[in-house]
Regions:
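Bacterial N-terminal signal peptides
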Residues: 43-55
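Active-site/ligand-binding neighborhood in enzyme catalytic cores
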Residues: 194-293, 297-300, 307-309, 324
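Glycine-rich FAD pyrophosphate-binding loop
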Residues: 86-107
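N-terminal Rossmann-like FAD-binding beta1-loop-alpha1 element of flavoenzymes
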Residues: 68-92
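Conserved FAD-binding subdomain of flavin-dependent enzymes
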Residues: 112-142
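Mobile amphipathic helical/loop "lid" adjacent to a hydrophobic cofactor/ligand pocket
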Residues: 140-241
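Mid-domain catalytic core of redox enzymes
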Residues: 289-406
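Conserved flavin/dinucleotide-binding core of flavoenzymes
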Residues: 354, 370-512
Length: 512
């Protein structure tokens, strides 16, 4: 039975119902003691009321807000909206915060300096790079995947032109040969990760930690093992004891061989989010909208959102919904029908990595010598201390220097917990600076702290993996509801972009 016939039948039933109601009312009127004039007025009132009711019943369903509703205006949500617009589909983004960009955040200061608060870089294999090229967003590459690092109190500066040259300055001949054999093995294992289903010998690596696997099977020297730990832990923002060997293989891909180059948006990564928003249309992005309900109906998807400013609820409708938020945020949403047991388990058993950021303004003349080697900056530096990774922010010539500390793991969790006051955190950082660079605290003028949600990036505990069946369940739609965001793929912004491509491809195939 087609939709037109159903609509006509619905209207006829409404007319029949209204007619019966009117007949009953007339009978009742005749039985009352109302005067003829009063009866006529009463009948006219009832007829008008039924007429309005009939008109309302015959109206079509409320129009769609868009072809696709996207929950979350981070990189994944913005990328999905970009691809949908390119394909001629309409999208509306609902974002719970007043901010566009998710973890993409750039802080600026009165003296013109700026530094990243959130996402520091985009790896060169990130699909978002192609979007940025299309939108003519200027980018720069200032360093390699490896960085200068401290090991047993000694700085190993990255002043070479490539990862292999840097490694030759860190490891002796025997250590380097063992490293090359191990790295070649890791590259082969990474290629096997592209197979579906994964070989059983790979799946068993979920049951051991990355740290134990390296210690027991790699053949790497203690120094080389520490190199792997120090360089990779800031990527997944937790201890290598807390992720599986299987996920460790995926993480090492960014460093293997010649490594991948990280990219940065000139002027701050926030400019990329702003450019994406302009392309999508800022009228297609609703801020301060906390999504609380997603209901699947015969005619489409209904999304209820609460305005964070006035707590007014509004219902939005679309053919499809894409959630592009961290998976733990799905626990804020009531789904009808409810999420499958497998998806709930995937969400509840996922872990996460933690970040904390400190911007440190220092006297440029007094401090620059601490991070230069033969007049050349050796930043970023992996400190393996509460200082985390030290990046250099952008500052005006002749002005103060701005350092960006990206703290991860246990130190970030401690600072984020607010169990320490700002003075205590500052003293902890100054003490770490003085241990690394004696006398440095005298050059520090100001610190600004930025806290992330305790779950800053996705992680999977030993026994779980981004490659297991639970993770796969969230890469499949539940009806017309899709799950995107970096938490559905990996620990990097690559996952945000890849997930956007995944869901848009499927939506377009089903729309054709």
């Amino acid at each position: 039975m087609n939709s037109a016939l159903l609509s006509r039948l619905s209207q006829d039933l409404a007319l029949l119902s209204s007619g019966l109601q009117l007949a009953n009312i007339l009978k009742v009127t005749q039985m009352t003691t109302l005067s003829p004039k009063q009866s006529n007025r009463f009948i006219i009132f009832i007829v008008l009321t039924l007429s309005l009711s009939l008109r309302s019943a015959a109206l079509p369903a409320e129009p769609l807000s868009a072809d696709v509703l996207i929950v979350g205006a981070g990189l994944s949500g913005l990328s999905a909206a970009y691809h949908l617009k390119k394909a001629g589909k309409t999208a509306l983004i609902l974002e719970m915060s007043p901010h566009i960009g998710g973890r993409i955040r750039t802080a600026s200061y009165p003296d013109g300096a700026h530094a990243e608060v959130g996402l520091e870089e985009f790896w060169e294999n990130n699909p978002a790079i192609e979007i940025f090229k299309d939108l003519k967003i200027p980018m720069e590459t200032a360093y390699s995947s490896f960085s200068s690092f401290y090991y047993q109190g000694k700085l190993y500066p990255f002043i070479q032109d490539s990862n292999p040259e840097f490694l030759r300055s860190v490891l002796d001949t025997d250590e380097l040969q063992a490293y090359k054999r191990w790295d070649a093995k890791m590259a082969e294992l990474y290629r096997q990760l592209q197979q579906r289903p994964l070989p059983d010998e790979l799946l068993t690596l979920m049951e051991t930690s990355f740290a134990d696997w390296i210690k027991n099977t790699s053949g790497l020297s203690p120094k080389a093992q520490e190199l792997v730990r120090i360089e990779t832990e800031p990527e997944y923002a937790t201890s290598w004891q807390k992720i599986s060997a299987l996920d460790g293989i995926a993480e090492w891909h960014y460093f293997s061989g010649n490594g991948l180059a990280p990219r940065h948006v000139i002027g701050g990564n926030q400019r990329a989010a702003q450019a994406l928003a302009r392309f999508i249309g800022k009228d297609r992005i609703r801020l301060n909208q906390l999504v609380t309900h997603i209901k699947s109906t015969v005619s489409g998807e209904e999304v209820t959102a609460t305005d964070q400013g006035n707590f007014k609820q509004q219902i939005f409708r679309a053919k499809y919904v894409v959630t592009a938020i961290p998976l733990f945020r799905l626990n804020d949403i009531q789904f009808t029908p409810e999420l499958s047991a497998e998806r709930k388990q995937a969400i509840q058993t996922q872990s996460a990595g933690a970040y904390f950021t400190a911007h440190v303004r220092v006297d440029n003349n007094a401090a620059r010598s601490f991070w230069t080697y033969n007049g050349k900056s050796v930043l970023p530096i992996m400190t393996d201390s509460p200082l985390g990774v030290i990046y250099e922010g952008e500052s005006k010539p002749g002005g103060d220097a701005l350092l960006n500390l990206l703290v991860s793991g246990a130190d970030a969790e401690r600072f984020n917990s607010r169990m320490s006051d700002p003075d205590q955190i500052q003293e902890t950082l100054l003490t770490a600076f003085d241990k690394q660079w004696p006398g440095f605290r005298q050059a520090v003028k100001q610190m600004s702290f930025y806290r992330y949600h305790p779950r800053a990036v996705a992680s999977w505990p030993v026994g779980r993996s981004r490659f297991d069946e639970l993770s796969d369940s969230l890469r499949k739609p539940q009806g017309r509801v899709y799950f995107a965001g970096d938490f559905t793929e990996d620990t990097h912004s690559n996952g945000a972009s890849q997930s956007a491509l995944r869901v848009v491809k499927d939506i377009l195939q089903k729309s054709d």
